[in-house]
């Protein structure tokens, strides 16, 4: 088995999907988790205005609506939270996403004060916090806020990790990679677009250029620029298609470098890192 085949098998990617079937699969998955854990009454998710959180948010809202109808328990709810660092440049996109999602509860926690305070506290030791490192502090501040809300509302935190993000490990360890449940896992980027289209989303919500937008020295830098490979190439790779040698090398390099992000803290019994 080639490395490409191993990755596809591990991430559970299908070359062709039925969007309606995958929507139902994700919604049922989210509902099943709530049923199994009756002490949970909510899902919490940060909404950025990008494709992934828009999709995960709408799926979560559908899941809790069905839970309320099926259980006659009106305490189930989806909590969407905006987590800007100061003023977000594409705030309009985030508001459009919220309009589409129609969450039960919409909150805002501005992370600027906490992220800046942590940066100052670390630099007070004499350590230098790079722009990239501060970007990770921002991502982890968002994780802390989501878990604080989940703790207040008997909730679980939804993550937006999907196959195209996972294969490149394009997420912050214990930041946006920190979550309880991943309803998009198994889907690549173009398949996520198919689900949003099937859900009736405005194409503008999934056709915008993806960006993590964590670095102040590189504001709005596109994911594809940071990765050195396009999402079309990543998706083709995950669907078992042939890609250029350069694209394959880049994708597989990210896969190897990011292995530590896909595991719990390493123990003496782990072998994957050797």
Swiss-Prot record:
Protein's pathway: Cofactor biosynthesis; NAD(+) biosynthesis; NAD(+) from deamido-NAD(+) (ammonia route): step 1/1
Superkingdom of the organism of origin: Bacteria
SUPFAM superfamilies attached to this UniProt entry: Adenine nucleotide alpha hydrolases-like
Gene Ontology annotations for the cellular component aspect, listed alphabetically: cytoplasm
InterPro entries membership: NAD/GMP_synthase (IPR022310), NAD_synthase (IPR003694), NH(3)-dep_NAD(+)_synth (IPR022926), Rossmann-like_a/b/a_fold (IPR014729)
E.C. number(s) listed in UniProt: 6.3.1.5
Biological processes per GO annotation: NAD biosynthetic process
Signal peptide extent: none
Residue numbers binding deamido-NAD(+): 140, 173, 180, 260-261
Keywords of the record: ATP-binding, Ligase, Magnesium, Metal-binding, NAD, Nucleotide-binding
Sequence positions that bind Mg(2+): 52, 165
Catalytically driven reaction(s): deamido-NAD(+) + NH4(+) + ATP = AMP + diphosphate + NAD(+) + H(+)
Keyword flag Membrane: no
List of residues binding ATP: 46-53, 160, 189, 211
GO molecular function: ATP binding; glutaminase activity; metal ion binding; NAD+ synthase (glutamine-hydrolyzing) activity; NAD+ synthase activity
Subunit structure as annotated in this protein's UniProt entry: Homodimer.
Classification via HAMAP family: NadE_ammonia_dep (MF_00193)
Annotated function: Catalyzes the ATP-dependent amidation of deamido-NAD to form NAD. Uses ammonia as a nitrogen source.
Family: Belongs to the NAD synthetase family.
Protein name according to UniProt: NH(3)-dependent NAD(+) synthetase
Species in which this protein is naturally found: Streptococcus gordonii (strain Challis / ATCC 35105 / BCRC 15272 / CH1 / DL1 / V288)
């Amino acid at each position: 088995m080639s490395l490409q085949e191993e990755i596809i098998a591990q991430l559970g990617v299908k070359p062709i999907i039925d969007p309606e079937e995958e929507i139902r699969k994700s919604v049922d998955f989210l509902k099943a988790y709530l049923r199994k854990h009756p002490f949970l009454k909510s899902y919490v998710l940060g909404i950025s205005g990008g494709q992934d959180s828009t999709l995960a948010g709408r799926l979560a809202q559908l899941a809790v609506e069905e839970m309320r109808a099926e259980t006659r328990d009106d305490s189930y709810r989806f909590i969407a939270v905006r987590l800007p660092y100061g003023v977000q440049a594409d705030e309009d996109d985030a508001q459009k996403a919220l309009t589409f999602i129609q969450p039960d509860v919409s909150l805002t926690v501005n992370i600027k004060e906490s992220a800046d305070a942590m940066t100052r506290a670390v630099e007070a030791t004499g350590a230098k916090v790079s722009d990239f490192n501060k970007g990770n502090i921002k991502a982890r501040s968002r994780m802390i806020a989501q878990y604080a809300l989940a703790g207040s509302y008997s909730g679980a935190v939804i993550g937006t990790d999907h196959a195209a993000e996972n294969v490149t490990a394009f997420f912050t360890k214990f930041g946006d990679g920190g979550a309880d449940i991943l309803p998009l896992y198994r889907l690549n980027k173009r398949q996520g677009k198919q689900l949003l289209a099937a859900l009736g989303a405005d194409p503008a919500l999934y056709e915008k250029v993806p960006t993590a937008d964590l670095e102040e020295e590189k504001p709005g830098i596109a994911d594809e620029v940071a990765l050195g490979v396009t999402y079309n190439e990543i998706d083709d790779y995950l669907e078992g298609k042939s890609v250029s040698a350069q694209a394959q090398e880049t994708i597989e390099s990210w896969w190897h470098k990011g292995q530590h992000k896909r595991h719990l803290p390493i123990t003496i019994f782990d072998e994957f890192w050797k």
